[in-house]
Regions:
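Hydrophobic alpha-helical segments at protein termini of multi-pass membrane proteins
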Residues: 1-186
């Protein structure tokens, strides 16, 4: 809900003068892009730092003094980094591509909510985003056991959302462009 309301407020107040439907796509690319940088980039930096500490034999400088749950958590991170392979990288890239497509799609839907002053589109964007979070929640709860299945479900949901957003994008009319002669007459 937070992201969709944030998009709504951005389109409504901060980006008022951006009225072209392409601006919705651009906003979605920026929103999804910064999220991808933060999620993948910071995770990669963390994994590289852990791998460097392990490879240099310096990990003890971090683990010394840790006890119980703290030590278990650090050891779990080390094990995760050690087992990280190409399949994990592919899965992460696929997840971000799906998320990026979703951000663009939801930006178009929210843009239409602002442009046509129809709050129902904002509600729909919130509902679609919530639905998109269900497979990951089911995985976390142990209902789904395969990250590949989660990504496949997300892909299906994302493609449906993208098809709907494309329809909404095409339905949006471009604002009338004021020509130089129109401005001179005013």
């Amino acid at each position: 809900m937070f992201e969709e309301v944030g998009r709504y407020l951005a389109f409504r107040f901060l980006l008022k003068r951006y009225t072209n439907r392409r601006d919705a796509v651009t906003y979605g690319i920026g929103h999804g892009g910064i999220e991808a940088i933060l999620v993948l980039g910071l995770t990669a930096i963390n994994n590289i730092a852990i791998a460097q500490l392990v490879n240099s034999g310096s990990i003890e400088t971090i683990t010394n003094g840790l006890t119980g749950a703290q030590l278990d958590q650090v050891q779990a991170q080390i094990a995760a980094v050690a087992s990280f392979g190409a399949a994990n990288l592919l899965l992460g890239l696929a997840e971000r591509a799906i998320a990026m497509t979703l951000h663009i799609s939801l930006s178009v839907v929210v843009f239409r909510a602002v442009r046509q002053r129809k709050a129902g589109y904002l509600g729909l964007a919130v509902a679609l985003h919530a639905l998109f979070d269900v497979p990951a929640a089911l995985f976390q709860c142990g209902v789904l056991h395969s990250t590949w299945l989660v990504e496949a479900l997300l892909l299906v949901l994302c493609l449906g959302c993208a098809a709907y957003a494309k329809k909404q994008y095409c339905a949006l009319q471009e604002p009338e462009q004021q020509t130089l002669s129109d401005k001179e007459e005013s």
